[in-house]
Amino acid sequence: ADIERSIDYVLDPAVAHAPPSWYTESRVYGRMAPRSDEYAAFERSMDYNFQWWLYNQEWEPWYGIFTHGDGKNYFFRNDWYEWSNNEPAMDYMWWMQFMRTGEPDYYRTAEAMSRHTMDVDNTHWPTGPEYRGDTNAALDWWEAKEAPSGSPYVGMGRRHGNQQWTAMLSAHVWTAGWIASYYLDGYHRGLEVAKKTGDYYQRRIFGKHGLTGRRLYLSVWNLVELYDATKD
């Protein structure tokens, strides 16, 4: 029993969090209400949809070294296709519902989905040279100067697809859930990756696509979320 309890502490560690009323009354995420019996039919519908997704994630199963936290979104001829790759801001949806309800399952799902999307569904390599000057200042400067340049697409996300690492697209990356994981989970990696995506949006490398439609609203949303978190 002691061993089982100790393993549970590792697999499902305790989390400090506030009650739903505190999150909703703070207005940090705008106007939203905690779960209430006053709108029972609405709440049942919300619970059904979230539980349906969790059921399918377990049943299929949708988890593994590269897919843990994600799920598929297209059902055709009795089979599921296309990993969601966080489209559109699914981890943020789970964080919001956790704040409304305080449900541990929603917290764990949001946590896993944010960590998956920020590291699997985003572009991290190859990065450009970075001059540090923390060992041999002169040598570091020349090595950084001569190093090959990195990819201009670091920070770009990927759209839904049959593989996790295909279909790179500028209009398919959402930082709101990653920053929520930084606030609610204390996960600094979320803010770190969000900054990389913010840098990408500032470069505005959209290929043949202009700054219109989703690229426009995502640029604004992602950068506003980052500004709120960093004031930079």
Over which residues does each language-model region extend?
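Catalytic cores of extracellular degradative/oxidative enzymes
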Residues: 1-232
